[in-house]
Amino acid sequence: MKDGEETPSVDGSTSASNREKLGTDLEIGPVDLSDGGKEEKVKDPNLVDWDGPDDPENPLNWTSKRKITATCSIALITFLTPLGSSMFAPGVGQLVKDFNVTSTELSSFVVSVYLLGYCFGPLIIAPLSELYGRQYVYHVCNILYVIWTIACAFAPEIGSLVVFRFFAGLAGSCPLTIGAGSIADMFVQEQRGGAMAAWALGPLIGPVVGPVAGAYLAQAKGWRWSFYVLAMAAGAITISSLFSIRESYAPTLLARKTKKLQKETGNMNLRSALDTGRTPKELFLYSIVRPTKMLFRSPIVFLLSLYVGVIYGYLYLLFTTITSVFQQQYNFSQGAVGLTYLGLGVGSLIGLFLIGATSDRLLNYLAAKNGEKKPEYRLPPMVPGAIFVPISLFMYGWTAYYQTHWIVPIIGTSFLGTGMMITFMCVSTYLVDAFTNYAASVMAANTVFRSLAGALLPLAGPKMYAVLGLGWGNSLLGFIALAFCALPVIFWIYGERIRTSPKFQVTF
């Protein structure tokens, strides 16, 4: 497909799924002939492309079993690495005593530094995946994740633990960075919503489940056991993924096909239909610049990434403070406090069910009604999802402040889980649909913003609550979230105009 923000169209009668399956055959361009104005494509005989729209080697045409197996493997990895971001949080109190840490900022940072790895990882991983393909990047990052997690388990002091956590986050950012790209490789637009829902479960449910398991592990075995369990689980998933994850990136597959045909035929003039003509060094540099360029040249990418970053920051602020809130306000034990995270988990599952059941159906309904598929058709569910976020913060903050029954603030956090899941899913599918060719890059830009907020915002949490209290502290966050509620409406109305405006075109 050509560079740009929309999937290029050929004519009004060609479906989006057929355009994606045909690949560059549809992009060579129509030639106007004299016989009645009919159009015919002229194909270079040295151009190596898919063997027609139904080529089984094209990941869009893989069997359902193969797609589901790959998606489940990617979803498992995407669940595990965010799980590692928060599983350690309930054991921080033990670590503080073991390492004689007196700084509250440092005790928060040892949790959130993992997300700094999420910030820098995508800037390297996304270009590598678009240069060398998805498969090898997954495998290398999975192995590195296991190594750094084991290092965390044996960290001798706080400084080394911070460093090891950073590198674990760096490697662990892989599935969050290129997972959406893998799904875009395998699923056409009208099937993408359900697959994206399965993949998105990890980054949102993983951090919620982590503290529940981590609290009981820390109480029973000590804080290091969080890392032992993570390393064992990651090792098992890494081994299974060696067999279940196959290369799905079309440019890489066509490049391999081209090399094979060159060897078989001796025709060195053969070239991939998706070959840009750039050297690997040029491609890598372009790919590194691409996420940053998309982030700062496209208002859509910037504002939606900022919004998701704010919500993700709120999530991790809760992770680093909810333990002290329920221990101080409600006298919960270390084990019991882990259960307070279940409100976020239940809310996220509700949000996942709602968006998974409606995203593709709504897209197809609006497309049938209006005669074409638009990325903006992913946005309507985001309106109620955005409203749930400030409701959650107001409810959680004031009920915890006045020490109402403990179930009420937990119910309040469930609204954050629901709103967060719906918002994250709508934003992810919208960006992937709008930037399908560069799905990994646009999600890298989104992940960087999201992770930066998740790493830094929790550092301000303890002082904010100390100055403003639980009520007004969370209300401040709620008012900020309330201001962002206008975004889905703005992009529903003006999104297409912004995407297609020459002023905001992102070219490479």
Swiss-Prot record:
GO CC terms, sorted: peroxisomal membrane
TM helices/strands, residue ranges: 73-93, 108-128, 143-163, 166-186, 197-217, 225-245, 299-319, 335-355, 379-399, 407-427, 435-457, 475-495
Region (Disordered), start-end ranges: 1-60
Phenotypic consequence of gene deletion: Leads to a decrease in benzylpenicillin production.
Residue ranges the record marks as coiled coil: none
InterPro entries: MFS, MFS_dom, MFS_trans_sf
Domain of life: Eukaryota
Gene3D superfamilies found in the cross-reference section: MFS general substrate transporter like domains (1.20.1250.20)
Membrane topology: Multi-pass membrane protein
The keyword Transit peptide is assigned to this record: no
Alphabetized UniProt keyword annotations: Glycoprotein, Membrane, Peroxisome, Transmembrane, Transmembrane helix, Transport
Domain notes: The peroxisomal targeting signal allows recruitment to the peroxisomal membrane by pex19.
Protein name: MFS-type transporter penM
Organism for this UniProt entry: Penicillium rubens (strain ATCC 28089 / DSM 1075 / NRRL 1951 / Wisconsin 54-1255)
